[in-house]
């Protein structure tokens, strides 16, 4: 199987000409599918989303990135992407779920950080340096009462990890493609 692998396109930061060139390249790619590991553009930029989705000529399997949710909440961003998957025949949003395509099990999850890179415990959300990370000022929490915190990311990470471990174990004898942000 031939796949076009995309990640962190950040279409919000490109000119119309640059985006047009990219969308043309995606449309003309001689591949069986597109695997996109998130951050195409912010979900509140409907024009870029429509252009991205209209460029698809083969199935696209997509997991959400953190920047997709900038200006909204993780929940609202997921709902937006689920809606787009219903509207666009080539767009498949993988949100801790999987699908089978051409004999491959494509398993998708955002798998955000758990802040435990060195295995020395959980980072406190009150630590000043984490407030400097843009996510914690631009992504609302799901209750819309403030911004997402490191603890929210840790919870999302744990949910994703549990799903991924279970699903990969269930399909260990098959061809598995793991798609995460």
Predicted regions and their residues:
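Beta-strand-turn-beta hairpins that frame and shape the catalytic cleft
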Residues: 1-4, 98-108, 127
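N-terminal active-site segment of His-dependent metallophosphoesterases
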Residues: 1-62, 68-76
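Short, Asp-centered acidic motifs that coordinate Mg2+ and/or phosphate
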Residues: 3, 32-33, 91, 175-177
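Proline-centered loop/turn at the N-terminus of a beta-strand
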Residues: 59-61, 92, 105, 175-177
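Generic beta-sheet signal
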Residues: 63-65, 96, 109, 179
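Glycine/small-residue-rich loop that forms an oxyanion/phosphate-binding "nest" at active or ligand-binding sites
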Residues: 74-95
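Active-site-proximal loop/helix segment associated with metal-binding centers of metalloenzymes
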Residues: 107-174
């Amino acid at each position: 199987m031939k796949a076009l692998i995309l990640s962190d396109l950040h279409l919000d930061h490109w000119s119309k000409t640059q985006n047009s060139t990219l969308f043309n390249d995606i449309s003309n790619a001689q591949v069986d599918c597109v695997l996109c590991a998130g951050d195409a553009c912010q979900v509140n930029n409907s024009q870029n989303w429509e252009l991205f989705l209209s460029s698809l000529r083969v199935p696209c399997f997509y997991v959400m990135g953190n920047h997709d949710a900038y200006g909204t909440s993780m929940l609202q961003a997921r709902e937006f992407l689920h809606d787009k998957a219903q509207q666009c025949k080539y767009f498949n949003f993988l949100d801790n779920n999987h699908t089978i395509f051409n004999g491959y099990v494509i398993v998708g999850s955002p798998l955000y950080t758990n802040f435990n890179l060195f295995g020395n415990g959980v980072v406190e959300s009150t630590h000043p340096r984490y407030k400097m990370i843009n996510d914690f000022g631009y992504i609302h929490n799901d209750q819309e009462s403030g911004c997402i915190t490191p603890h929210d990311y840790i919870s999302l990470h744990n949910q994703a990890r549990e799903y991924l471990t279970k699903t990969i174990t269930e399909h260990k004898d098959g061809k598995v493609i793991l798609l995460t942000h």
